[in-house]
Amino acid sequence: MAKVNIKPLEDKILVQANEAETTTASGLVIPDTAKEKPQEGTVVAVGPGRWDEDGEKRIPLDVAEGDTVIYSKYGGTEIKYNGEEYLILSARDVLAVVSK
């Protein structure tokens, strides 16, 4: 995973989606038009967290760079940077962190 010069703001997370499956368990090739949108990816960068209600301190995020996360199917904003595709998610769009 290459270093990216994108720094998310507040409680935003920059994720690079893992590749979608290209074949089924039985060996059938899945055409591009029928592929499911991936819901798992690797965290590339993390914002500093959002401010608490008093605006006095930041609330840290539960994820860190390098974590593998599962996120909402339709969450986030897709971007392209230096030929790579990324997703900017809100911390609320992250459903789970995958343990290694």
UniProtKB/Swiss-Prot annotation:
SMART domains: Cpn10. The gene is groES. It holds the Pfam family Cpn10. GO terms for biological process: cellular response to heat; chaperone cofactor-dependent protein refolding; regulation of DNA-templated transcription; response to antibiotic; response to heat. SUPFAM superfamilies: GroES-like (SSF50129). Transmembrane segments: none annotated. Induction: Induced in response to heat shock (45 degrees Celsius), pH 4, pH 10, ethanol, H(2)O(2), hyperosmolarity and starvation. GO terms for cellular component: cytosol; extracellular region; peptidoglycan-based cell wall; plasma membrane. Gene3D superfamilies: GroES chaperonin. InterPro entries: Chaperonin_GroES, Chaperonin_GroES_sf, Chaprnonin_Cpn10_CS, GroES-like_sf. Keywords: Acetylation, Chaperone, Cytoplasm, Isopeptide bond, Stress response, Ubl conjugation. It is found in: Cytoplasm. There is a cross-link at residue 100 (Isoglutamyl lysine isopeptide (Lys-Gln) (interchain with Q-Cter in protein Pup)). This is Co-chaperonin GroES. N-terminus is acetylated by RimI. The keyword rRNA-binding does not apply. Belongs to the GroES chaperonin family. Together with the chaperonin GroEL, plays an essential role in assisting protein folding. The GroEL-GroES system forms a nano-cage that allows encapsulation of the non-native substrate proteins and provides a physical environment optimized to promote and accelerate protein folding. GroES binds to the apical surface of the GroEL ring, thereby capping the opening of the GroEL channel. NCBIfam families: PRK00364.1-6, PRK00364.2-2, PRK00364.2-4, PRK00364.2-5. The keyword Chaperone applies. PROSITE patterns: CHAPERONINS_CPN10. Disruption phenotype: Essential, it cannot be deleted. GO terms for molecular function: ATP binding; metal ion binding; protein folding chaperone; protein-folding chaperone binding; unfolded protein binding; zymogen binding. Heptamer of 7 subunits arranged in a domed ring. 2 rings join in their base to form a spherical cage-like structure; both heptamers and tetradecamers exist in solution. Interacts with RimI. The modification N-acetylalanine is found at residue 2.
